[in-house]
Amino acid sequence: MRTYLRVERLVNRLSDLQAGTSEHDHHFALQTLFELMDMGSRADLRGDLLKDIDRQKGVLAGYANNPNIDESALNDLLRQLDDAHHSLNETTGKLGHSLSESEFLSAIRGRMGIPAGTCEFDLPAYHDWLKQPVGARQKAIAQWMRSINPIPSVLKLMLGLLRDSAAPHSVVAKDGMYQQNLPQSRNVSLIRIGVPDGAGWVPEVSANRLLISVRIMRIEDGHRTQSMKADVDFLISNCG
């Protein structure tokens, strides 16, 4: 799950940077693309997503013929899962593996691991590319981004279904501590906690199959954290 969330964060960042117009935007877009390739080389995202799609289809199939369920919406979700499964089966190799064959990108990737390693005298061809018109750079990055398809769209579908599987409910952390027992019959894959902007505190979460534990940490000067000794209301969703 943490791998899914990290990939989602990188994909969103890459999309934002690709749409940018400055040389710095597109430099960091490539850096983000290389981070995605690094993650893809260490994790079998395709295999994990295929397993999770099959599991999700099994869960949704259990709602068939339920009078309280919108059959049209259910069939639409099952169709989306079938399409996602098919698109993943049509792909081969690791995330972005085809980009490894580009000498241009491989040279940039190799130098990005070195502090200030992408100066003009290190990578003149790269800096020539950075001086191209904005539209040309955006088009090139969009083309390179296709190498990670269909992972972003499949991941968006799966995480969306997971997040929508539970409604948030209000709880109170007494003296900054909250614990909740989990039923053995339910598999919780993701815990979501609502933190208001500027709240001045962050949650420190630990969990296993049977118990969720949340400690509220106050943010002090210097961005240090300290256990809070006050009651705190917050929203929590146990998704799974």
Tell me the role of every PLM-derived stretch.
Residues 1-51:
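N-terminal ordered "arm"
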Residues 5-8, 12, 34-38, 54, ...:
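Generic structural signal for well-ordered, non-transmembrane alpha-helical segments
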Residues 84-189:
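Charged, well-structured binding/catalytic surfaces in domain cores that contact anionic ligands
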